[in-house]
Amino acid sequence: MILTTTHEIEGRRIERYLGIVFGEAIVGANVLRDLLAQIRDIVGGRSGAYEAELRRARETALAEMAEAARRLGADAVVGVDLDYEVLGSGNSMLMVTASGTAVKLAP
């Protein structure tokens, strides 16, 4: 499955647009609290544990979006966009959303 932020794929022709697809991942309160507790891991102003958790959430959102596209019979998702939003009381959760347009490529 090709995922790209561009609206076309170099060297390939889009045969059909299949629709908008999404994937979401939410990092809950306990995870954020644990990550903040590990602030001692910060080296050079960066927290390896926090970045790893964000990476996992991003990968989950992208994988869910790709699976939604696969169910539509897509070969690729173009115009991929990632959004991050803080949710919950006390901003205790982080939601990562991936969205894009599922497409069928010409053979």
Swiss-Prot record:
InterPro entries: UPF0145_dom_sf, UPF0145_YbjQ-like. Coiled coil: none annotated. It comes from the Bacteria. PANTHER family: UPF0145 PROTEIN YBJQ. Belongs to the UPF0145 family. HAMAP family: UPF0145 (MF_00338). NCBIfam families: PRK02877.1 (NF002776). This is UPF0145 protein TTHA1256. It comes from Thermus thermophilus (strain ATCC 27634 / DSM 579 / HB8).
